[in-house]
Swiss-Prot record:
Protein name per UniProt: Interferon-induced GTP-binding protein Mx2
Positions of region (G5 motif): 322-325
Family in the record: Belongs to the TRAFAC class dynamin-like GTPase superfamily. Dynamin/Fzo/YdjA family.
Ranges for region G3 motif: 221-224
Designated gene of the protein: MX2
C-alpha cells in the first residue's frame, strides 16, 4: 500500500489504540462475540418504545449481553465447545433478533421500507468474495469480470446440526445438501434472473446456511464496482452497478461493510468514496482490509495508520483479514485450514501481530464484530421499524378503501354497487355545500375558501367608495363649467348626484363578475376532485360525472351572472327609503361637521375635495349625500352579491348535480360501461391486498417478538 494521501474530506483523527494484551495461548475459534466499544463485560441495547400500549423497555433490557468471562480481557478467547456456558445465553438472545429481521425480509417487507442489514461492497478484485467465503464456509462464484450479478442475502445460522443450505429466488426454493452445490446454484439463479449474459438485476437471491461452524449473521453481498465495460458488458454497466449499490447503502438502516485491499491507495477506492457520499461522518461504515500478505516491505506502517484510523477516519473503525489466495484456491485449501494459516500469519508478523492482540484481525474476530454490530443496529431500529410498518399499513388500507371493492358480475349486484358509489359521492357533495366535509391538516373547507373571496369583495367596495370622493370635485366643476344655468352657487344638482352614483356602481360590475368566476372555479374544481376521489378507478363513470360537473358549473355561472347584472341595473334607479336615507344622512353630517368629535384636519382626510374657508359648498353637499347614499348601498351589495353567488353556484349546483347523479341509475344498460375499471385498477387492488397482508404479518411478527422479550 503506497503512502497515505489526504485527498478525502476527513481530518486525521488520532485515537488511542487499545492497549496490547499479553500474549497467551488462545483458541482462535471463539464461540461468543466480543462487543467492541461496549462497557466492560457487557453489551447493552437500550430501547424505549411501546407496542399495543405496553412499554417494551423492560423486555428489551433482556438484550443486555455479557459474553465475557468475569475478569477476562477483551483479547482473550474462551474455549470452544459445549463447556462454554456463556455462549448459550448470548446465542439465545442474538438469534431471535436476526431471525426477526430475516423473517420480515422473507415476508417481502423490504419492498415497503428498509430493514437493518449489513451490505458488503468493494471494488472488483478487492477480496470481497474471499471474505464472504471465509465467513460462510461455502464457495461462492469466482472468476474474472462481474461475478455477483444480483444482490445475495447470505443468512448464516449457527446450530449444532449437520450442514444445511437453502437457496430461494422468485418462486424457486431449493434445499442444498452439500456446500459444493452453492456456487453452481447461485450461478443458475443469477442466469434465471439477470439472463445468461453479463447483465445485472436488483432482484434478491437468498442463501441460507445452517452449520455449527458459521456465525449468527446476515449479510447482503452486492456486485463489485467496475469502472470500464469489458467485452459484451453494457457500456453503462458501471453506472448500473453503482445505482444498485447506492440503493442499499444510502438507507440509514444499513451498515456498510467496505472491503479494501491493503496493497492499494485507500484514497483511490471507489467503494469508500461511495460510502462517504451517503455516510459523510462514517457513523455506519466499517472498513475491512484484505490481502495483508501482499503489502510491500516497508509499507506496513501505512496499513497500521489505516487500522488506527489515522488515514481515513471511520467511527466504527477497521478490521483486517487474510483469506485464501488464488494459488491456495487452486490447491483446494479448505477454509478451516485457511483460517489456521491466517491466525499463524498475524501471530508471526512483526508489524501486524499487534492487530491480532487488539482483536482487530482474523475472520473469526470479524464474525464476532459483525454479529455485535448487527444486533446493536437491529435493537436501535426496532421502534422506528414498528412505527413505519404501522404507518405504511394504515396508508395502504386507506388506499385500498379508495379503490373500493371489486365490481360484481351480476347485473342486479352492479345496480346496488353503483347506487352505493353514487350515494357516497352525493353525501360528499352535501357535506361540501353545508361546510361539514372532513379536511386534512393545513387544508381549508370549501366554505372558507369562498368566504375569503367574499371578504375581498368588501375591500373592493371600500376602495371604490374612497375613489368616488375624488370624482365629486371633478363632476361638480364640470357641471359648473358646462351646465349651470341661473342657479345660485351652492345649490346641489340632482343630475350630478345621479351621474356620480351610477358611474360608481358601473365600476363595481366587473369586480363582482370577476369574483363570480373565481368562486365558480373553486366550486367546480372541488366537485371535480370529489368525483376523482370517488370514481377515479372507473374512467367512464368519472368522465361522465366530470362532464356533469362542468355543465352544471357553466349553467350556474350563467344564471348568477344574469342575476348580478340585473342587481346592478336595479341599482341604477338610485332609490332609498326616506326613513333609512334620513338616518344615514344625519349620521354622515354629524360625523363630518361635529367640531367636538373631529379635528379640522380630519375633515380634509375624509373629504379631500373640501377647500376654502366655507366647508358648506355644493361640492361638500354632494359629497355628504354620496357618502350617505353609499353607506346603505355598500351594505346591500356587500351581502347581496355573495348571496346570489352562493345560492346559484353552491346550493343550486349541489341540488342539480345530486339529481343528475341519481338519474344515471335509470340507464340499466349503461351499468357495465359506467363500472368498467381502469386496466391497472385490478392489479393495484391485488398489489395493495398483498402489501396489507405482508405488513399485517410483519406487525404480528413484531408483536410476538416483543411478547417473547417480556417473558
Amino acid at each position: 500500500m503506497p503512502k497515505p494521501r489526504m485527498s478525502w474530506p476527513y481530518q486525521r483523527h488520532r485515537q488511542a489504540s487499545s492497549p496490547p494484551h499479553p500474549h497467551k495461548e488462545m483458541n482462535f475459534f471463539p464461540q461468543q462475540p466480543l462487543p467492541l466499544g461496549a462497557g466492560p463485560g457487557q453489551m447493552t441495547f437500550p430501547l424505549n418504545w411501546q407496542m399495543g400500549g405496553k412499554d417494551l423497555t423492560k423486555g428489551l433490557n433482556m438484550l443486555t449481553l455479557s459474553p465475557q468471562q468475569p475478569g477476562g480481557k477483551s483479547g482473550q478467547q474462551t474455549s470452544k465447545g459445549p463447556e462454554n456456558n456463556l455462549y448459550s445465553p448470548f446465542e439465545e438472545k442474538v438469534r431471535p433478533c436476526i431471525d426477526l429481521i430475516d423473517s420480515l425480509r422473507a415476508l417481502g417487507v423490504e419492498q415497503d421500507l428498509a430493514l437493518p442489514t449489513i451490505a458488503v461492497i468493494g471494488d472488483q478484485s478487492s477480496g470481497k468474495s474471499s471474505v464472504l467465503e471465509a465467513l460462510s464456509g461455502v464457495p461462492l462464484p469466482r472468476g474474472s469480470g462481474i461475478i455477483t450479478r444480483c444482490p445475495l442475502a447470505l443468512r448464516l445460522k449457527k446450530k449444532e446440526c449437520p450442514w444445511q443450505g437453502r437457496i430461494s429466488y422468485r418462486k424457486v426454493e431449493l434445499q442444498l445438501q452439500d456446500p459444493s452445490q452453492v456456487e453452481r446454484e447461485i450461478r443458475k439463479a443469477q442466469d434465471a434472473i439477470a439472463g445468461s449474459g453479463v447483465g445485472i438485476s436488483h432482484e434478491l437471491i437468498s442463501l441460507e446456511v445452517t452449520s455449527p461452524e458459521v456465525p449468527d449473521l446476515t449479510l447482503i453481498d452486492l456486485p463489485g464496482i467496475t469502472r470500464v465495460a469489458v467485452g459484451n458488458q453494457p457500456q453503462d454497466i458501471g453506472l448500473q452497478i453503482k445505482a444498485l449499490i447506492r440503493k442499499y447503502i444510502q438507507e440509514q438502516q444499513t451498515i456498510n461493510l467496505v472491503v479494501v485491499p491493503c496493497n492499494v491507495d485507500i484514497a483511490t477506492t471507489e467503494a469508500l468514496r461511495m460510502a462517504q457520499e451517503v455516510d459523510p461522518e462514517g457513523d455506519r461504515t466499517i472498513g475491512i482490509l484484505t490481502k495483508p500478505d501482499l503489502v510491500d516491505t516497508g509499507a506496513e506502517k501505512v496499513v497500521l495508520n489505516v487500522m488506527q484510523n489515522l488515514t481515513y477516519h471511520l467511527k466504527k473503525g477497521y478490521m483486517i483479514v487474510k483469506c485464501r489466495g488464488q494459488q491456495e484456491i487452486l490447491n483446494k485449501l479448505s477454509l478451516a485450514e485457511a483460517t489456521k494459516r491466517e491466525i499463524a500469519f498475524f501471530h508471526s508478523h512483526p508489524h501486524f501481530r499487534i492487530l491480532l492482540e487488539e482483536g482487530k484481525a482474523t475472520v473469526p474476530r470479524l464474525a464476532e464484530r459483525l454479529t455485535v454490530e448487527l444486533i446493536g443496529h437491529i435493537s436501535k431500529s426496532l421502534p422506528l421499524l414498528f412505527s413505519q410498518i404501522k404507518e405504511i399499513h394504515q396508508s395502504a388500507t386507506e388506499e385500498l378503501r379508495l379503490c373500493g371493492a371489486s365490481v360484481p358480475s351480476n347485473d342486479a349486484d352492479k345496480m346496488f354497487f353503483l347506487i352505493e358509489k353514487i350515494k357516497v359521492f352525493n353525501q360528499d357533495i352535501e357535506n361540501l355545500a353545508e361546510g361539514e366535509e372532513i379536511v386534512k391538516e393545513k387544508e381549508a373547507r370549501l366554505y372558507n375558501k369562498i368566504r375569503e373571496e367574499f371578504k375581498s369583495w368588501i375591500v373592493t367596495l371600500d376602495c371604490n367608495s374612497k375613489k368616488v370622493k375624488n370624482i365629486i370635485h371633478e363632476e361638480v366643476s364640470k357641471y359648473d363649467r358646462q351646465y349651470r344655468g341661473k342657479e345660485l352657487m351652492g345649490f346641489v344638482s340632482y343630475k350630478t348626484f345621479e351621474s356620480i352614483v351610477r358611474q360608481y356602481l358601473e365600476e363595481l360590475v366587473d369586480p363582482a363578475l370577476g369574483m363570480l368566476q373565481t368562486v365558480v372555479e373553486i366550486v367546480r374544481q372541488t366537485f371535480s376532485d370529489t368525483a376523482q376521489k370517488n370514481f377515479g378507478e372507473f374512467s367512464n363513470l368519472n368522465q361522465t360525472t366530470q362532464n356533469k360537473v362542468d355543465s352544471i358549473a357553466a349553467r350556474a355561472a350563467e344564471r348568477a351572472e344574469g342575476l348580478i347584472r340585473l342587481q346592478f341595473r336595479m341599482e341604477q334607479l338610485v332609490f332609498c327609503q326616506d326613513d333609512i336615507y334620513r338616518v344615514d344622512l344625519k349620521a354622515v353630517r354629524e360625523e363630518l361637521f361635529n367640531p367636538v368629535a373631529e379635528h379640522p384636519q380630519s375633515l380634509q382626510l375624509r373629504l379631500p375635495f373640501v377647500n376654502g374657508p366655507s366647508p358648506v359648498s355644493s361640492i361638500t353637499e354632494i359629497g355628504v349625500h354620496v357618502n350617505a347614499y353609499f353607506m346603505g348601498t355598500s351594505q346591500r351589495l356587500a351581502n347581496q352579491i355573495p348571496f346570489i353567488i352562493q345560492y346559484c353556484v353552491l346550493q343550486e349546483s349541489r341540488d342539480h348535480l345530486q339529481k343528475a347523479m341519481m338519474q344515471m341509475l335509470q340507464g340499466r344498460e349503461q351499468y357495465s360501461w359506467l363500472l368498467q375499471e381502469e386496466s391497472h385498477t385490478s392489479a393495484k387492488r391485488h398489489f395493495l391486498k398483498e402489501k396489507i397482508h405482508r405488513l399485517a404479518e410483519a406487525r404480528h411478527t413484531l408483536s410476538k417478538f416483543a411478547q417473547s422479550l417480556q417473558g
